[in-house]
Amino acid sequence: MHNKTVRHLTILILTIAGIFIIDQNIKSLFVDGYRYYSDCIDLILVYNKGVAFSMFAFLDESLKYIQLVLVFGVFGYMLYLNQLCYAIPAGLMLGGAFSNIYDRFIHGGVVDMVYWHCGFDFAVFNFADVMIDVAVVWILLLNFKPKFCKNHS
């Protein structure tokens, strides 16, 4: 393996592991009973059976296997690209995705806890969801502004 590949893989795997560990630790607080209520944001426990905004909840048990295939596909594609500039954003995305899929296997649904209701009701979400959103924006930026990625080809 080339140094570039080893470095890319190391950064990718460490980022995935870091996001997974942080997210699962946050979620364990809520599974264990922590709650917080305020005028704008409540921290509550919700098990989301679907994906964003509970879409595809009708897929029930199949959803976690479909997501697993998609996530391993993205992981494989990131390895194929072997672009160092994608290692951290891909790690954020994959770490969040693996954590949410893990929830489906362990809890029967994704553990969500942040409920924004200041001015309007927003979907309940978690740290992994935020990391996935940040990663998508970062990856789009790298794709549309190649100058941000020195080894972008």
Swiss-Prot record:
- One GO CC term on file: plasma membrane
Keyword Cytoplasm tagged: no
Location in or out of the cell? Cell inner membrane
Pathway named in the protein's UniProt entry: Protein modification; lipoprotein biosynthesis (signal peptide cleavage)
The GO terms describing molecular function are: aspartic-type endopeptidase activity
Give the Pfam families listed for this entry: Peptidase_A8
Keyword vocabulary terms for this entry: Aspartyl protease, Cell inner membrane, Cell membrane, Hydrolase, Membrane, Protease, Transmembrane, Transmembrane helix
Q: Name one GO biological process term.
A: proteolysis
Q: What class of enzyme is it?
A: hydrolase
Any keyword Cell inner membrane? yes
What EC numbers are recorded for this enzyme? Answer: 3.4.23.36
Protein's membrane topology: Multi-pass membrane protein
Give the protein family.
Belongs to the peptidase A8 family.
Q: What is this protein called?
A: Lipoprotein signal peptidase
